[in-house]
């Protein structure tokens, strides 16, 4: 949801926060932090004070009453608690984008990476890139088939090696087909009005990782494109317990990740004309 601001913070950084190489035009495009770090720190403080992801909807937000009613109906549900990020989840990336409407109104949009305790969409936060109902339907149908293979494999005796190998091979093929079908639901756009499937956009010497296009930056940039907003700055920070690899710490800012974001952000930022090299 777009949250309008009365005025924009004076704090500003030209450092690139989100960037990537665009194979279509042969340039690296980037989006700076701008004033987004200020609003990210504000978000961090609000979450620490509230204790959950169900932040009150500020005045001036379109559809405020309906949105607030949705949040009120979820109040008290432990799945939205910030405690989740200090436990088994080992933290999560959150992001804020400063942007403006076509009429010049400046505001912010907030996002969380991936799922929050298996929840893809929380009122007040940027939705996922893919069509969520369609994604859930495809995933449920495909997972059912994969699970049926697993059940058959588990029921076989150890000496039935040839059949076991065949079923495992078929299960692996089904899993790959399901992932391909799910990836096909991710349609990415840029600021030239072009749209392409995720697999056509992604470029890297490494394979495409699970969760590509689910991080904060792609979510926020996609939301801006779908709602005709002009991004001015972006900031992503880590919330919660330090991750296992000790590369993320609570409250620290991090640029868009090299593995999943940079291979698609070049295309997504093409046409924005903040910085191109």
Model-based region annotation:
Residues 1-277:
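Catalytic cores of nucleic-acid editing and processing enzymes
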